[in-house]
């Protein structure tokens, strides 16, 4: 889609060197050099170009259907806040004909999520959009703070990632919504490709850059309108538009493996600014060679579309990942309770200690 540089009749531009002028309007001073193509743009042209690119991504990938009810995974952070603002803006401008709902998950992280949810509630008022909040405590009877106290901080992102993804699906299903959009940006996508390579997780490489994902048999699909949008530009857009967002990092994030991939990405980007898009495009072209089937194997393989035997959630295994994690948590909590039982006498404590020994 083509666009025309916005005019500014009120603030007439002062004379500046040609090399400092915006490459689009040729009248205002350039304030940004875009990392993906190194073009120099002024504030007004950058915002218009950024909005137009998101619209083009939505149209090119046919993300929305008229009359569709769409849930924005809202955390209060920069990505989801800009996403909510952008979808509201573009829906009004281009008449997508979609109904937008803010869907938030309260993981139960005191001093972080409670503050970010306050931002989401302000966004609800600012954008005039309905808001629904679901909590880990209600869905799983655990908060993230409780999980960390039992499982340790190094495992926090594993639990949070699994429970959060499932919570978004469960929340959307309860609201009768079949489409969830998330604020995953180009940096996130490139980091995911790198993480899968570093972990040797080839099974996920092929689908790690998909803009739309949906398990077979699932009524919920997910899409990422910011797939080609750099994080730097999302932050800059939020700054220029004076959007209200929460910028504090999660309490447990520093221990995440993603942080290692992020630091590596920053080093690469300093040498080659286009590396983020380059990695995404490489990921898009990755395909796994089909494996030969072994007729003698009698292992029953579960594919997407099967249901967890415990909770009924979609799972590629007999027991879903969330239920497996919950089982481990309950066992750990029981063990902690036994070890903290001060009512037991000395002999009983010694017996328990002996039972742990192997000979």
From Swiss-Prot:
Interacts with NCS2 and URM1. May act by forming a heterodimer with NCS2. Component of a large molecular weight complex of more than 250 kDa. Transmembrane segments: none annotated. This is Cytoplasmic tRNA 2-thiolation protein 1. GO terms for cellular component: cytosol; cytosolic tRNA wobble base thiouridylase complex; mitochondrion. Disulfide bonds: none annotated. The keyword Membrane does not apply. GO terms for biological process: protein urmylation; tRNA thio-modification; tRNA wobble position uridine thiolation; tRNA wobble uridine modification. Pathway: tRNA modification; 5-methoxycarbonylmethyl-2-thiouridine-tRNA biosynthesis. Gene3D superfamilies: HUPs. InterPro entries: CTU1-like_ATP-bd (IPR056369), CTU1_C (IPR032442), Ncs6/Tuc1/Ctu1 (IPR000541), Rossmann-like_a/b/a_fold (IPR014729), TilS/TtcA_N (IPR011063), tRNA_thiolation_TtcA_Ctu1 (IPR035107), UPF0021_CS (IPR020554). Its EC number is 2.7.7.-. Keywords: Cytoplasm, Mitochondrion, RNA-binding, Transferase, tRNA processing, tRNA-binding. It is found in: Cytoplasm; Mitochondrion. HAMAP family: CTU1. Belongs to the TtcA family. CTU1/NCS6/ATPBD3 subfamily. Plays a central role in 2-thiolation of mcm(5)S(2)U at tRNA wobble positions of tRNA(Lys), tRNA(Glu) and tRNA(Gln). Directly binds tRNAs and probably acts by catalyzing adenylation of tRNAs, an intermediate required for 2-thiolation. It is unclear whether it acts as a sulfurtransferase that transfers sulfur from thiocarboxylated URM1 onto the uridine of tRNAs at wobble position. Prior mcm(5) tRNA modification by the elongator complex is required for 2-thiolation. May also be involved in protein urmylation. It is an enzyme of class 2 (transferase). The gene is NCS6. It comes from the Eukaryota. GO terms for molecular function: nucleotidyltransferase activity; tRNA binding. CDD domains: CTU1-like.
């Amino acid at each position: 889609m083509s666009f025309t540089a916005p005019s500014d009749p009120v603030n007439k531009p002062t004379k500046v060197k040609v090399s400092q002028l915006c490459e689009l309007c040729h009248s205002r001073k350039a304030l940004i050099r875009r990392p993906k193509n190194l073009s120099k743009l002024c504030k007004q042209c950058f915002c218009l170009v950024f909005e137009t690119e998101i619209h083009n991504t939505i149209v090119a990938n046919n993300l929305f259907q008229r009359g569709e009810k769409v849930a924005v995974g809202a955390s209060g952070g920069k990505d989801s806040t800009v996403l909510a603002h952008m979808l509201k803006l573009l829906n009004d401008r281009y008449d997508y004909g979609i109904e937008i709902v803010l869907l938030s998950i309260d993981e139960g992280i005191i001093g972080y999520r409670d503050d970010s949810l306050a931002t989401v509630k302000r966004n609800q008022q600012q954008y005039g959009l309905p808001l629904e909040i679901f909590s880990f405590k209600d869905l799983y009877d655990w908060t993230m703070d409780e999980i960390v106290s039992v499982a340790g901080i190094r495992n926090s992102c594993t639990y949070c990632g699994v429970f959060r993804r499932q919570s978004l699906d469960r929340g959307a299903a309860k609201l009768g919504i079949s489409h969830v959009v998330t604020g995953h940006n180009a940096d996130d996508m490139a980091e995911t490709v790198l993480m899968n390579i570093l972990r040797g997780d080839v099974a996920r490489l092929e689908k790690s850059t998909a803009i739309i994902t949906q398990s077979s048999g699932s009524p919920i699909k997910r899409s990422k309108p910011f797939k080609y949008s750099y994080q730097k530009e999302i932050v800059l857009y939020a700054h220029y538009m004076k959007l209200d967002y929460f910028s504090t990092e999660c309490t447990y994030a520093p221990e995440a493996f993603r942080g290692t991939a992020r630091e590596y990405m920053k080093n690469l980007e300093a040498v080659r600014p286009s590396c983020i898009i380059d990695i995404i495009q490489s990921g898009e072209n990755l395909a796994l060679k089909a494996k030969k089937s072994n007729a003698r194997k009698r292992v029953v393989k579960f594919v997407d579309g099967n249901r967890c035997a415990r909770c009924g959630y979609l799972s590629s295994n007999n027991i879903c990942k969330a239920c497996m994690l919950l089982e481990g948590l309950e066992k750990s909590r029981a063990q902690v309770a036994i070890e903290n039982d001060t009512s037991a006498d000395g002999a009983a404590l010694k017996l328990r200690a002996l039972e742990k020994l192997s000979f």
